[in-house]
Amino acid sequence: FSLAETKFQVIYVGDDKKDLNDSSIVLKLTYGNTTYLLTGDATNKVEKQILDKNLKSDVLKVGHHGSQYSTHAQFLKAVSPKYAVIQVGKDNSYGHPKDVTVKKLESIGAKIYRTDKDGTIILSSDGENISFETVKTDTNG
């Protein structure tokens, strides 16, 4: 579906009643020539199921808070993001994001933004370029 100049494509609709993380909707957003892949809490299981889709995106909202159960190598290769955004609470009890996930993102040259270190992350785009602004508060670094 479309909203003004923005196109939304539902890549995956989860129905796994046993694992709520894999019940996440995966959504690809296209605005002009910029693309964004929003993965919710999807894990490797979902990532493998959607590899046959056009996943190439400028920005990846990293799945499952950067846990070791998401962002596998084949998926990252298919997405090839320039930027990665990890939504994660500071000093969370799960230890997210995991170092292995951060290293995978670094290895492909993605610029990483993290809410635990960068605070609020604001993306802006004119359809050609993407810019980021971060706003730190007392609760996130």
Give the residues covered by each predicted segment.
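Cap/insert and terminal regions of metallo-dependent hydrolase folds
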Residues: 49-120
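Core dinuclear metal-dependent hydrolase active-site scaffold
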Residues: 1-59, 117-141
